[in-house]
Amino acid sequence: MSKLVPFETTFEVRDTCLCLHAQRAARALAKRFDAVFRPVGLTNGQFSLLMSLNRPVPPPMAPVARLLAMDRTTLTAALKPLERRGLVEVRVDPADQRNRLLVLTNPGREILARAVPIWRATHQSVEEELIDPDTLRRELIAVL
């Protein structure tokens, strides 16, 4: 017979689990940013992906996947709708045919330019709700 977990443990996890609180906070922030990005036709994840491609030289997939904390398969799936909309292109790396470069197109740059002021305003609003956003940011980065 398996040992049952006491009901009190449910409250312990609810009240103290850092993973649970991080998940809930991430979902709340994602929902908030999704709502404000809707008028420009982006989700919060798409904004982050486009921003990660906003570089002088198109990056290969691997560093972008690392930055966004996703595997290449997930990144490929996330790129598909952006490719269909003409915001991103995936090109063969001329220096190494096995690699792919991720190119932010001009329409991608334009939509990103419209989204950045929205991000700034919403981000400022979120930071104003926090007691110490810089400490929170450092602590979140430390977990990575």
PLM feature segments, named:
Residues 58, 80-138:
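Charged, amphipathic alpha-helical coiled-coil/dimerization segments
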Residues 21, 48-51, 110:
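Pre-recognition alpha-helix immediately N-terminal to the DNA-recognition helix
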Residues 1-40, 128, 135-138:
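N-terminal leader segment of winged-helix/HTH proteins
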Residues 42, 56-59, 70:
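The short coil/loop that forms the "turn" connecting the two helices of the helix-turn-helix
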Residues 50, 64, 82-85:
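Basic amphipathic alpha-helical segments that dock to polyanions
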Residues 67:
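Residues within the alpha-helical elements of helix-turn-helix
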Residues 43-45, 60, 105:
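Residues that mark the N-terminal boundary/hinge immediately upstream of a DNA-recognition element
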